[in-house]
Amino acid sequence: MKMLTKFESKSTRAKGIAFHPSRPWVLVALFSSTIQLWDYRMGTLLHRFEDHEGPVRGLDFHPTQPIFVSAGDDYTIKVWSLDTNKCLYTLTGHLDYVRTVFFHRELPWIISASDDQTIRIWNWQNRKEIACLTGHNHFVMCAQFHPTDDLIVSASLDETIRIWDISGLRKRHSAPGTSSFEEQMSAQQNLLDGSLGDCVVKFILEGHTRGVNWASFHPTLPLIVSGSDDRQVKLWRMSATKAWEVDTCRGHTNNVDSVIFHPHQNLIISVGEDKTLRVWDLDKRTPVKQFKRENDRFWLIAAHPHINLFGAAHDSGIMVFKLDRERPCSFIHQNQLFFVNAEKQIQSFNFQKRVASLPYASLKGIGQPWDAFRSISYNPSQHSVLVNEANGKFALVILPKQPVGAVEPTSVTQDTGNFATFVGRNRFVVYNKNTESVEVRSLENKVTRNIKVEETVRTIVAAGPGSVLVIHPREVILYDVQQGKKVSQLAVKNVKYVSWSLDGQYVALMSKHTITLATKKLELINSMHETIRIKSAAWDETGVLIYSTLNHIRYSLLNGDRGIIKTLEKTLYITKVQGKLVYCLNREGEIEILTIDPTEYRFKKALVNKNFPEVLRLIKDSNLVGQNIISYLQKSGYPEIALQFVQDPHIRFDLALEYGNLDVALDEAKKLNDSSTWERLIQEALAQGNASLAEMIYQTQHSFDKLSFLYLVTGDVNKLSKMQNIAQTREDFGSMLLNTFYNNSTKERSSIFAEGGSLPLAYAVAKANGDEAAASAFLEQAEVDEQDVTLPDQMDASNFVQRPVISKPLEKWPLKEAELSYFEKAVLGQIDDLTIDDETPAVNTTQEQEEPLGEENFNDEDIGEDEGAWDLGDEDLDVGEELPEEVEQGEITSPAQEVETAIWIKNSKLPAVLVAAGAFDAAVQALSKQVGVVKLEPLKKYFTNIYEGCRTYIPSTPCELPAQLGYVRAYDDTVSEDQILPYVPGLDVVNEKMNEGYKNFKLNKPDIAIECFREAIYRITLLMVDDAEDEKLAHKILETAREYILGLSIELERRSLKEGNTVRMLELAAYFTKAKLSPIHRTNALQVAMSQHFKHKNFLQASYFAGEFLKIISSGPRAEQARKIKNKADSMASDAIPIDFDPYAKFDICAATYKPIYEDTPSVSDPLTGSKYVITEKDKIDRIAMISKIGAPASGLRIRV
């Protein structure tokens, strides 16, 4: 048994606590007169209630109404509203402190117990006191209604417990009936007498030797439990006629303040001032578990009315907890779920038939009765299960062949160990905490192998045949238990549970609030955070993760897109997702099948994968609506698809503008018809150069000045002149004047000034533009002599606007018409043979979801380790995709030589094809043009190999040359002549050379490794592939080979330096770390640089290299050494020897001089490998591949048919 704390509050002394029946709320009564309302699920304080004067002691939520009641040392009882968070009214009548208050479960009553030695019952609807129960002769510490019967139990400091019968009170206050005048008078007198006639003492229980602090009824049995200042917990039983003491639980060392029955199990829970919370076995009356706080006395314990939660009030606040885990153990094998039910019986559930079997066996004999199992693992070959207990033990149980009921298992092997799980048909692993190792054991429980584990292990999970995931507090490590070594690791904190995808390619690592998605090799894909606690997860057949929190079922795509599928009324644990069905286990160990709508997440996944036929099918067949889908489509860059879901004009207008669809935007703008919408449409039309649409909008909106400017910029002179007339008709002086500038109409402009009364301006315009007649007329009109007018010394003619050179007005910019997307073509019916049938990807339902078993040959012999000179690790490196080991050679054909080779050259001009056809000169010219090849000697043997490799010969006598028989083609299923090509060695040969290079790198043979990588480059140069994926992979391998050659060449240069050249040695060690090597290989370079710089007191540089090293390897002896170096270097923080290396600057390394080429510095590149050189190296031979000329003009390597 373990206390799992779900929430804690820090405050002054808490005297009372109450759970809301349906919401995750808890009320806390504080000694400081405050009542707090907490959301214990979110850990947030919702409200404070500050109306009591003095300490608050009693609290209770109403079972159905949004109210609660409180009582305290101010002698009052207050009823509060949860809707308004205000006090509704106050009940007065008690003459001393009120200790407890509780609602009746059915009737509108409140019961209160007080230090005035009375128990009072109130009607909270009419706010009247309906009974006052007297009889105790000391403080009444507690009084409660019976859950179902008309009984009350009360506890007092007079050392007694009283059971009261209130059936008469119920009868009197039930539905009104006819009563005589005498009965009414009797009822009033009875109330004045304290209603003792309606509430009578049924039993008085004596046995405690000091005051009794608490008494509680059992929820279903005729039992009472009490706690007293005599430090004892007593159990009482009652019948219809008598009540008696059953037993006493001793163990508390101070006053017992509160005690209750466990609502669901045969347990008693008590708290006391000895700072302990104790759990007792109800059947045996023996202690089960004790939980102690260091400094806080407990004052009250309360149980949630419906779920397995408890709350305890103590000196510094409250704690909400549950006793032990409620997650049922389960394991999926093929189409069956094996699980442990609430009675600790193992059952199976068939997903195909949707039925649960009878129990196979009872597991009650394993472990402690109150401790839940941590996990189970199933072995189908032996039909057995491994059961992990909570106390560091496990049991191997062989199940009956057929479920026959809850029988005791015939074969049970128990031993010490944690996290036992099967990894093969006859092997399982278990963590031995004492030796800190993972032990591989046989079915006879004999240890066959030990794997040392350095850090604390939280759990171990099967990861496929022969592999396990070891979960550490800060990382997850994938181990190959057959070879006894790490395969990969991922830094992720506090992982609790793991879920593998159906195909085993992806894994979800779940902590309390985080899900991390990774590949099967623990390469990080995505990580997401949830506010609500994550409970379980399973992958559906389409590769979408479905997971549950406390109150939701949610989904997540690999790219991090997620959403809510369904709201849960109670916590469920997902075991399998199949189509629209989600199979779950509840906390009672029962199977529940939920129906969900997977349309939303399948729609999003199809959109991410660009599976447009599926997108179209889902749109047509499903009811996909809502802002969620629309905003998702908008965010994902598919506004044209979002338009299909929207009817609202505002949203359609926004989407059309985002998509650039002016036609739809215009239709919606006409519906909306407001100025802001038209303005936005104009801006978009102008941005797209659609002058005709902008013209139409300006006309409808009467924006004449903007329309004039539009005509000006588009060169529409005729319409621009008409705007002058329109302005005159409108008598708009400003518009008239503006149009004269646009039209260069100086005569009209001077006339407008004159008509406006500005004769000086009219005269100046006429004079400046040479209109002497008009100028004289204006002088005459002003009655001014020309000699009296002073003009500026220099005036230019006011032809501001150049006449357009275009002959025809521009209505639309000549834009390139965008191609229709697949989706748009499908909507328009432009896709032939489009089928949108509802086809769910076929999934083999018999495939194991989390099956750790297989037919592997498990070798118990120790596997030898490489004794490489680096001595820095022995991890292998995978390059690119896994390629076939054997090339499928085509059938041998024998046409005439000239015909066959001519067909090859006709079908492809790749260098490899030309070499195979024997056209060596043409091949050399092609290589020279593509990648600048000038040195042919290294390629000679590859020319010969390719030429001879695509031909077959007949063996002859030793003195004769072999006769050629035929040719080997690349494809044996070629049906047309234009697809006939020769066989050329493929990527498998390249991959073999790369792996050979990695091996020599690890063995510290840099010169041999360089030759291997260089040979891989030569192979790629004469390669032939037939798809884009292989082409991309080949170029990637070429870049990788270049980086390894560069890095190893730098290291060889460093080793060749003479002693005393420290600066250059440190520089080369630093430059080696800049080569883009595999992370595990880069650690070699980082360790060399770190050690050398630390040795020569370059502490700043050493700290940087140590930090980079720890990013790759965070545990183990080398990591510990790096951590020490970093700590020491950080404390010194200085460099003794300045070098030309800035770790934070962007630069490349010259492959000839091994010096940095910083950004914006002139450089040249090799056309084949892409390596960088200083400008002085131009026209020299490349140092990486040794066959091409640096800086030569080239078109790029072509290897794809």
Swiss-Prot record:
InterPro entries: Beta-prop_COPA/B_2nd, Coatomer_alpha_WD-assoc_reg, Coatomer_asu, Coatomer_asu_C, Coatomer_complex_subunit, G-protein_beta_WD-40_rep, Quino_amine_DH_bsu, TPR_COPA_B. It comes from Saccharomyces cerevisiae (strain ATCC 204508 / S288c). Residues 842-862 are annotated as: Disordered. SMART domains: WD40 (SM00320). WD repeats lie at residues 9-39, 51-81, 93-123, 135-165, 207-237, 251-281. It is found in: Cytoplasm; Golgi apparatus membrane; Cytoplasmic vesicle, COPI-coated vesicle membrane. This is Coatomer subunit alpha. GO terms for biological process: endoplasmic reticulum to Golgi vesicle-mediated transport; intra-Golgi vesicle-mediated transport; intracellular mRNA localization; intracellular protein transport; retrograde vesicle-mediated transport, Golgi to endoplasmic reticulum. It comes from the Eukaryota. The keyword Oxidoreductase does not apply. Present with 15200 molecules/cell in log phase SD medium. GO terms for molecular function: structural molecule activity; ubiquitin binding. Pfam families: B-prop_COPA_B_2nd (PF04053), COPI_C (PF06957), TPR_COPA_B (PF23953), WD40 (PF00400). The gene is COP1. It is a peripheral membrane protein. The coatomer is a cytosolic protein complex that binds to dilysine motifs and reversibly associates with Golgi non-clathrin-coated vesicles, which further mediate biosynthetic protein transport from the ER, via the Golgi up to the trans Golgi network. Coatomer complex is required for budding from Golgi membranes, and is essential for the retrograde Golgi-to-ER transport of dilysine-tagged proteins. Oligomeric complex that consists of at least the alpha, beta, beta', gamma, delta, epsilon and zeta subunits. Interacts with the ESCRT-0 subunit VPS27. Interacts with KEI1 (via C-terminal region).
